[in-house]
Amino acid sequence: MPGKVYTDEMEGKSIKKKKLTETPLPKLKKRKMQNGETEDLDLEHVTESVNGEINNNNPTPKLKKNKKPAPKSDLSETAEQCDGEQPDPSTPTPKKVKKKKLKEGKEDSDAQEETNISLSSQGGQCDGEQPDPSTPTPKKIKKKKLKEGKEDSDAQEETDISEPQMNGVKSVKKSKKNTTGDEPAPKKRKTDTSEITAANECEEKELTKEEEEIKKEKIDGDFSKFPISKDTIKNLQAKGVTYLFPIQSKTFHTVYSGKDVVVQARTGTGKTFSFGIPLVERLSEDQQPLARGRAPRVIILTPTRELAIQITNELRSMTKKLKVACFYGGTPYQQQVFAIKDGIDFLVGTPGRIRDLVQNYRLDLTALKHVVLDEVDMMFDVGFSEQVEEILSVRYKPDPEENPQTLLFSATCPDWMYNVAKKYMRKQYEKVDLVGHRSQKAAITVEHLAIECNRSQKAAVLGDIVQVYSGSHGKTIIFCDSKLQAHELSTNCGSLKQSAKPLHGDLQQKEREVVLKGFRQGTFEVLIATNVAARGLDIPEVDLVVLYSAPKEADAYVHRSGRTGRAGRTGVCISLYEPWEKHYLRNVERSTGITFKRVGIPSLMNVAKSSSADAIKSLDTVPADVIEHFKEYAQELIEKKGALTALAAALAHISGATSIKQRSLLNMEAGYMTITLKSSVPIHNLSYAWRSIKEQLGEDVDSKIHRMCLLKDSMGVCFDVRSEDLQSMQESWSDTRRWQFTITTELPEIQESERSFDGPRNRSFGGRGRRPFDRRNNSRNSSGGGGGRRGRSGGFRRGR
């Protein structure tokens, strides 16, 4: 038995200890103790405790120190305290103190002694834990510890060495308590003390990394560190801005001092305020009289009308004294001419309309002191370079040192943009890059997901995607590649339960403004837009962005995904891609530094969960007086169907889930269900799974299994089965120690499909002639060939 073996070991140790006690030094020490010659005893202790034991064997100062300070939680300090409690056997008083401590520890009468006992229980070698002072075992352990103290020169190492011995003493104490019937109170106190210590450590680490970053941002962006007027601070606080964001705090002094700057920052980080606040302060400090008909001193050019309107509203919210005008196409010239005659301080607009006003309506730009080009990469990419150059030529001179202050802002900075900077800026211009070449260029507050989906199934599953990731009351922007596609989805997408409206270039400017205003105010939940809404628009609280097609360009994806996750909020961006579009995702990943998380369509369980949550929220909006009229019918329904069934049916009807359509989680095709076959060992080839499946379900099962693929961890496979074949397959299948057959409710991570290719649809590429794993498809147009030639022998062949 373990106890017997332990007793034998202890007996063996006690025999060795007896041999040690036969040496003349301990006898002489014992005789001196009885004679009370304490001076000689101290000298011997100095000789024996070269490694630091003299402090532990001087009982008088230790007993005095042990009562004053609070108990120490560190193990080394606890061991030192326990050693300090061991009295000198030469005086009888310390032994009485031991017994008194033991008695008080059992009766829980003294809080300080209780703490010492519980701490000594952690160290395992406190004298207060000895149940019977007459037993010689503690004295032997004490001498053994003294011997180890001689051999140890480091106090920390001494504690580490004595730790296993302390545990051994604790075990002896436990066995004695079991025989004598003593209560294990010290053990309980040990557990409580450790729990309290762990709780204290958790409290010290309350601030997460994100909270610490926010705290640092608040300190760095405190208004008191910047020359901002009280009126501007008051206006900013009215908008909920209590400190400057990192991009604003890092660029404020540079812009305020009049230097030229090129700024690259992620979307949604507050670029508008980064140039708006310092320029407002510069113009407010200018003593120039605000005469009627004055020429603008600041011009801000944007690529889109919507961005120009947004910047105008932000500037007007910061200052009431300075005049802000916004000029863009699609609006009457008359109002803009009146604004010119009235006088302008900030001029915001698109290049086309401003150029027309300069040429035909005598818009004076000779007084410009500050020029801002926002989203400059898009502005030059869409063909505004000539118009911008024509506008700026009025004020810019060959000598760049005499030109106005020039500020370039963008989320992406191609190499050619720095050539533009050299053309318009002074030689000593500054670069502020908050993105970096190797870091993630997309918004870090956005989760990037990708769902593989055939083109014919996209409209059918779009409603489930919006429902799960945004809900019935969240805001969603769906980006399309064409105006026609945006219009069709907004009018004919039956899967969308939320109200939706389109936004594209064919709409009149007044209609576009009405649509954006309604979306901001929550009049409708889904905005289906082309690239018009991708740049610069700050629409608050957008929960979800959906790209109806795979992103073709990295810069376009950065701006589209940046419509969510703005101003510190989190968001989700989902890209729907077809099997042949996978290479587009890889290009975006390489260029932006993000990683798409491949997921399947939302499962029926997730859709039902989200719909039920929205239905429950909608119940709170029903007035109490209306509920009174339905209580009678509700009671009848409960009596007829039962409360649970009746309420579940009501929630299903409210959420619109009146029918359930089974769909594949692999490609969203209707009428299929996805199965996961888990393996107990890793597999690296689909043939292992096919062999096991055919052994149980027969050779003809390959016509019933479609789109088989390996799981990412190689611990199984995933495939689709027709809904009508599922029941018979379940009845014929029996789980084994190696394979487990389950119906998939949420798509697991899978490996890249071996049958996928990076070319366009309905095309095949030759090679080794590998047969595709979709066993239904026997067409020659989708199978590989021998390679090298056209036609049946392989090579390249167009689908018919």
From Swiss-Prot:
Residues 252-431 form the Helicase ATP-binding domain. Its EC number is 3.6.4.13. Residues 1-200, 750-800 are annotated as: Disordered. Residues 114-124 have a biased composition (Polar residues). The keyword Phosphoprotein does not apply. Residues 464-620 form the Helicase C-terminal domain. GO terms for cellular component: cytosol; mitochondrion; nucleolus; nucleoplasm. It is found in: Nucleus, Nucleolus; Nucleus, Nucleoplasm; Cytoplasm, Cytosol; Mitochondrion. Keywords: ATP-binding, Cytoplasm, Helicase, Hydrolase, Mitochondrion, Nucleotide-binding, Nucleus, Repeat, RNA-binding, rRNA processing, Transcription. SMART domains: DEXDc, HELICc. A motif (DEAD box) lies at residues 374-377. Residues 1-14, 752-761 have a biased composition (Basic and acidic residues). GO terms for molecular function: 7SK snRNA binding; ATP binding; ATP hydrolysis activity; RNA helicase activity; rRNA binding; snoRNA binding. Residues 789-800 have a biased composition (Basic residues). It is an enzyme of class 3 (hydrolase). A motif (Q motif) lies at residues 221-249. ATP binds at A265, R266, T267, G268, T269, G270, K271, T272. This is Nucleolar RNA helicase 2-B. The lineage of its organism: Eukaryota, Metazoa, Chordata, Craniata, Vertebrata.
